[in-house]
A protein has these predicted regions:
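A short, small-residue-rich loop immediately preceding and capping a beta-strand
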Residues: 117-156, 235-253
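Active-site-proximal loop->helix
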Residues: 124-125, 136-193, 276-289, 295
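Positively charged, low-complexity intrinsically disordered leader regions
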Residues: 2-122
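Active-site/ligand-binding-proximal alpha/beta "capping" segment
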Residues: 195-249, 253-254, 258, 316-327
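Short internal alpha-helix immediately C-terminal to a glycine-rich phosphate-binding loop
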Residues: 103-125, 135, 220-234
């Protein structure tokens, strides 16, 4: 631990009115003090205010007027899925700042660096490699803490991601566009290797950050358990599968928690157009946000039970189904 940097950062944060939420508070927002809670709930969920860090969890009410005891979720009806099993979908859209749960991973990866003094706000830049939402989360967290940051993502990602980033970064040069689309993770790594030559760049790489794994195992896992227990009620319903896309394997870590506590199996989803785990294959696809073409260091592969290939044609058709009058 670098105590002098920790003390300097603490003074800097005090001057900016920054209070960092604990992992325990994000796992259970009932632990957040009433004073902080009352302040947070008066803010716009996307405001560049450090108090919004206390919304970086699964328990935000849909209108963001309160915190919940159970995460927002939906149960897909059998008429839609064609199967009898209840399929519970936990909703990440109610996270603050970026309307996606990747902001949680970004905070979980940055927090230890702040606490141990390895990140010096006066000279370091946080570099956020991503296929889209993780770098948005990292830029958002950095911005409200007063830290410098760089976003790296493929040039072929959605325009909405780039529009958002341009509003949040200090300088448009802090958005680095690499070649390719969703599957081109190697090109992101190549850019990181170049940036890492400057020792003031701290590469916070979600694909090999064990804090990404630990954050989701602790927070997302227990949050999803509450969703299941709510749906189960007083019935004999059993949790059979936890299903998550491969991506950085952060969200997959919740499966390890659920397997340990609910005895679930873990199913890993990847695009059939880029069947890395299924066939050691590669290719291009348009399921934005799940990455591909490599197995992340933090993926607990031997604890995964099934790999599920999904075509981007299927996901594109679902977008049409739910977003057109004909659908």
């Amino acid at each position: 631990m670098n105590s002098s940097i920790v003390e300097k950062t603490a003074a800097y944060f005090r001057g900016k009115g920054v209070i960092l939420p604990t992992i325990a508070e994000l796992k259970n927002p009932n632990l957040i003090s009433e004073e902080i809670k009352n302040k947070v709930l008066t803010l716009d969920k996307d405001a560049m205010d450090p108090a919004n860090l206390f919304r970086v969890h699964w328990f935000n009410q849909r209108d963001h007027s309160n915190f919940l005891d159970v995460p927002e979720h939906i149960v897909l009806p059998s008429e839609f899925t064609g199967v009898d099993a209840k399929i519970i979908v936990n909703l990440g859209r109610y996270f603050p700042l970026i309307t996606a749960h990747k902001v949680l991973a970004a905070y979980g990866c940055l927090l230890p660096r702040i606490l141990n003094g390895s990140f010096d706000y006066s000279k370091h830049k946080a570099v956020w490699p991503s296929t889209g939402n993780y770098c948005r989360g990292g830029v958002a967290i950095s911005k409200i803490l007063g830290l410098k940051s760089i976003a790296i993502l493929p040039e072929g990602m959605s325009q909405e991601r780039f529009n958002w980033l341009e509003k949040w970064v200090e300088d448009k040069n802090d958005i680095i566009k690499t070649k390719g689309t969703e599957s081109n993770v190697k090109e992101i790594y190549d850019a990181c290797n170049e940036l890492e030559k400057n020792k003031n760049n701290d590469i916070i790489n979600q694909f090999n950050e064990y804090y990404n794994y630990a954050t989701h195992r602790a927070i997302t896992g227990s949050s999803f358990e509450k969703s299941f227990l709510k749906v189960k009620g007083n019935t004999n319903l059993q949790a059979r599968f936890y299903v998550s896309a491969s991506g950085s394997s952060g969200t997959l870590a919740a499966g390890d928690y659920l397997k340990e506590n609910l005895n679930t199996k873990i199913a890993v989803v990847e695009a059939i157009e880029c069947p890395t785990l299924l066939y050691n294959g590669y290719g291009e696809h348009n399921i934005q946000g799940i990455g591909d073409k490599h197995v992340p260091l933090i993926h607990n592969v031997m604890n995964s039970d099934f790999v599920v290939g999904v075509s981007d044609e299927a996901t594109n058709n679902l977008n049409l189904l739910f977003n057109t009058n004909e659908g």
